[in-house]
Amino acid sequence: MHELSIACEIFEQVMSTAKEHGATEVKHVTLQMGRLSHTNPEQLSFCFNVLADESIAKDADLIVEMIPPSLECECGYKGAVDEKKIRENCEFESELLAYAAVMECPVCGKPAQLTGGRELIIKSIEIETENQD
């Protein structure tokens, strides 16, 4: 379960940022998570909450925005993977295998390069400070 190590990294970054800005409470943490990151949002949230239990982030909401995979092709196409096609053709247990099986350009049909969908980014951290009313 790599979610624990990822949650530790996120928690450390959140706490470092909160301290840097004089936070008294962390209210919300918003993440952008690629669908191909092989990270379970529920497990990640659970691990984060366990780590945050006795900190200023104990009541923080962890909001996860899922990012679909994106492609780039030598024909010039840049855009999202056709998820409808994946659902129609998905016979695999692993979501990654399903996406990998259709990494072709929707314009020309040639193999395309995966350019997004594996990222995990802290998009925003909402904090409260003593000076806030």
Curated annotation (Swiss-Prot):
UniProt entry keywords in alphabetical sequence: Metal-binding, Nickel, Zinc
Originating species: Methanosarcina barkeri (strain Fusaro / DSM 804)
GO biological process terms on file: protein maturation; protein modification process
Recorded family membership: Belongs to the HypA/HybF family.
Source organism superkingdom: Archaea
Name of protein: Hydrogenase maturation factor HypA
Function of the molecule: Involved in the maturation of [NiFe] hydrogenases. Required for nickel insertion into the metal center of the hydrogenase.
Binding-site residues for Ni(2+), renumbered to this chain: H2
PROSITE patterns assigned to the protein according to its UniProt record, in alphabetical order: HYPA (PS01249)
